[in-house]
């Protein structure tokens, strides 16, 4: 029997120090920020990350970079959108995120480090008892967000004037592969698009490389676009 145990003991000795305890849940801050700033949420003790979206020609179209504290607060967040020629860079300062260049107060926070208000746009956010942002509102629109039991964003519904835009996501049943998902977009209950994503994962159950297929069904014939997402993630 001891000979049968030997390979197991060797495996433990060789790998035990490198074993990673996988966190399957998403923090309220990570889930809510990913909703608002349009990036894939990550799990575990993330220190910093860069998420890059590339088109079929390998050209970068969007990039999101963030640094987080050990408590899971975003210390900084940078969003580059080359398709729309925009760049937003935010840094944490007490109860606000300031513009990294002008130091103007851009986003007011609530609780530990959760979104509360975007004064320049007249947008305010509401949270549930667990700290997840579940509603955003302004004079022009209302948005409601949905999450599963692990805090994974399941979509949102936006109402503005006489239009209702709803995005509903269905993640993989494998809790490790949460970022493998399909999603459907409805405009006034009419289907106008769908999305499918599949990824490779690291040992924290976070996506490293993903293929994202976006189909615009609002035009005839439908237009399909294929993107690649590259994630670079450092952990505490």
Swiss-Prot record:
Lipid attachment, kind N-palmitoyl cysteine: 17
Localization in the cell? Cell membrane
Gene Ontology CC annotations of this record: plasma membrane
Pfam families found in the cross-reference section: UPF0257 (PF06788)
Q: Where is the lipid attached (S-diacylglycerol cysteine)?
A: 17
> Which residues does UniProt assign to the signal peptide?
1-16
Q: Where are the transmembrane segments?
A: none
Bilayer topology reads: Lipid-anchor
InterPro entries from the entry? UPF0257
The record's keywords, sorted A to Z, are: Cell membrane, Lipoprotein, Membrane, Palmitate, Signal
- Main location per UniProt? membrane
Give the family, as the similarity comment puts it.
Answer: Belongs to the UPF0257 family.
Q: What is this protein called?
A: UPF0257 lipoprotein YnfC
The organism is Escherichia coli O127:H6 (strain E2348/69 / EPEC)
Phylogenetic classification of the source organism: Bacteria, Pseudomonadati, Pseudomonadota, Gammaproteobacteria, Enterobacterales
Query: What's the gene?
Result: ynfC
């Amino acid at each position: 029997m001891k000979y049968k145990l030997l390979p197991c003991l060797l495996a433990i000795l060789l790998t035990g120090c490198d074993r990673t305890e996988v966190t399957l849940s998403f923090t309220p801050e990570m889930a809510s920020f990913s909703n608002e700033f349009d990036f894939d949420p990550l799990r575990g003790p993330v220190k910093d990350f860069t998420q890059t979206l590339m088109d079929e020609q390998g050209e970068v179209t969007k990039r999101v970079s963030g640094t987080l504290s050990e408590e899971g607060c975003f210390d900084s967040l940078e969003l580059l959108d080359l398709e729309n020629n925009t760049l937003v860079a935010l840094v944490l300062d007490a109860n606000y995120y300031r513009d990294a260049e002008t130091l103007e107060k851009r986003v007011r926070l609530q609780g530990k480090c959760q979104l509360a208000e975007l004064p320049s746009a007249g947008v305010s956010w509401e949270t549930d008892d667990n700290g997840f942002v579940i509603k955003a509102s302004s004079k022009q629109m209302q948005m409601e967000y949905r999450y599963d039991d692990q805090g994974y964003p399941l979509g949102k519904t936006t109402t503005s004037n006489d239009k209702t835009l709803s995005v509903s996501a269905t993640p993989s049943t494998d809790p490790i592969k949460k970022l493998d998902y399909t999603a459907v977009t409805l405009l006034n209950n009419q289907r106008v698009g769908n999305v499918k994503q599949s990824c490779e994962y690291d040992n924290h159950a976070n996506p490293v490389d993903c293929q994202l297929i976006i189909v615009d069904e609002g035009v005839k014939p439908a237009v399909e676009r294929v993107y690649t997402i590259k994630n670079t993630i450092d952990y505490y």
